[in-house]
């Protein structure tokens, strides 16, 4: 039976803004990959439409400043693209009663890549308004550059 996982998306103050659950697909020292099903109402973001039942394969890292979600359509299984959140490195912990808990502080800056390669860098104004120190700003910008390079090369979580 797959191991369950609960994901907490945190704001900069460390408060939970969204929580969801999924199933662990694999885990290593610095990464957990999970599958979660989108349970919210349909959302058309302009560059992707997400709907109830869409399957997300989510990659979280304890040593990287981002997470990556590969999104698949609920009805036909077609790949929609990768949604990437720039975050502080995730905390991945075993829960006392079993399963895992993943917690990541969202830094507002996001990256989306469509299957054809078109890129969208999102929420730059919101990111710029956060009270981050120079080291965090640098780490976040480096994370975005790393994501773009990995996506262009089809490596890491972008390998299909």
Task: Indicate where each model-derived feature is located.
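Short acidic-glycine loop/turn motifs at beta-strand connectors
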Residues: 27-30, 74-76, 114-118
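A short, polar/proline- and glycine-enriched secondary-structure boundary/capping micro-motif
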Residues: 43-49, 95, 130-134
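A hydrophobic, small-residue-rich beta->alpha segment in the mid-to-C-terminal subdomain
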Residues: 103-148
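Phosphate/ribose-recognition catalytic cores of enzymes acting on nucleotide-derived substrates
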Residues: 49-95, 102, 108-109
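Cysteine/selenocysteine-centered motifs that mediate thiol-based redox chemistry or coordinate metal-sulfur cofactors
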Residues: 146-160
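Short, well-ordered strand-loop elements centered on a beta-strand within folded domains, enriched
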Residues: 32-36, 78-85, 118-125
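Charge-rich, low-complexity N-terminal segments
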Residues: 1-55
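Long, hydrophobic N-terminal alpha-helical segment
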Residues: 14-19, 141, 150, 154
């Amino acid at each position: 039976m797959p191991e369950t996982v609960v994901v907490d998306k945190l704001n900069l103050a460390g408060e939970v803004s969204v929580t969801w659950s999924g199933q662990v697909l694999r885990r290593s020292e610095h990464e957990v990959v999970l599958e979660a099903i989108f349970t919210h109402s349909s959302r058309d973001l302009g560059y992707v439409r997400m709907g109830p039942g869409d399957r997300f394969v989510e990659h979280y890292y304890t040593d990287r400043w981002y997470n990556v979600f590969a999104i698949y359509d609920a009805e036909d299984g077609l790949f929609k693209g990768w949604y990437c959140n720039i975050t502080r490195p995730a905390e991945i912990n075993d829960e006392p009663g079993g399963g895992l808990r993943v917690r990541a502080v969202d830094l507002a800056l996001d990256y989306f890549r469509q299957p054809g390669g078109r890129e969208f860098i999102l929420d730059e104004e919101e990111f710029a308004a956060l009270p981050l120190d120079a080291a965090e700003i640098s780490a976040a910008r480096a994370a975005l550059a790393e994501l773009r390079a990995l996506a262009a090369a089809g490596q890491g979580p972008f390998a299909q």
